């Protein structure tokens, strides 16, 4: 990989003045060899397997960060879906113990999060998945670093409404900090570096590094420098900035993988915001010409932005992976959160934007007294978009006790301030109480 002096200078400016960083180095590890018929042997095998990786992950990332002069915000582990490990155990209490083990392992070695406490239930619920589902609320409420998801829909199988309903009940039983580590997903790829969607895919090598990038402040500066540019010029400028951001992610990923002696996987092209000033995707959209994110034109602006990021990033990475598009996590983007609190952007507006981004409804606050029918229906709406557009999407809702629309709840750190939105004027939605799985759409027929 070669860099010319001008490109190096541009990247240095981004690092020093535009909040450019690497959002996450995620080491994904195959934990299926640790499957055992009893809990004690499972935990012993997990410890033997994961300790060497966990011990070396942060030192390797810090060495690369120091060498390159790049800030790496978080280091993360991802494990094989825990539901698979629970198949011989079939016990929710065992699942809680595994979550506690992963949490302590991460804390002991300075790993910020562990993903993969998850199950794929888009076609049905297996014995291990049932145990995991039963454990999720207790496991996430009692840990700090464990993240998980339920994949409740796919283009190939449709939408499992029973899984959607169970996921809704889980969401409403989670404390706000725990809810930030849980998502309901669809069509989830195997190499996601972002939480809570990270897990070790069945088609991956035993250990692989995947990279999540950031940099909306870089793109905002570029957009603001072109106030009178035509749309094609604006698109091209965003594309070129995304290229530079992704090149940095590729370089860091290769170096960390080399330090760890594992495979380098992919760069997730998604430009992730943070609660910091000058690090907002919503601010980019407003710089493009929106009076406020959520105003008419927001879907168009986000589509233009996402397309440019994908095209620029794809040229810069040897392999693209994960979700690769644009992130609009409401609480993690200070400008987006403020717009939501003001009512400029609504739940339905966010659903519309989900059609052209890659996160779905992410980090959206809702009153904790909302009924499970409403939460299930919100999830089902996003699952329907994912299935019929054949794309990965997720739902990460934060129930806030005693809150009303327009209120904030401060989660702190990268999670930011959760803006609570109006979820629904209705309390019962009988449609989502119907049993069964909604069949896949016409997109399924195109796949043979």
Curated annotation (Swiss-Prot):
This is UPF0210 protein Pars_1033. Belongs to the UPF0210 family. It holds the Pfam family DUF711. InterPro entries: UPF0210. PANTHER family: UPF0210 PROTEIN MJ1665 (PTHR37560:SF1), UPF0210 PROTEIN SPR0218 (PTHR37560). Transmembrane segments: none annotated. Gene3D superfamilies: 3.20.70.20. Signal peptide: none annotated.
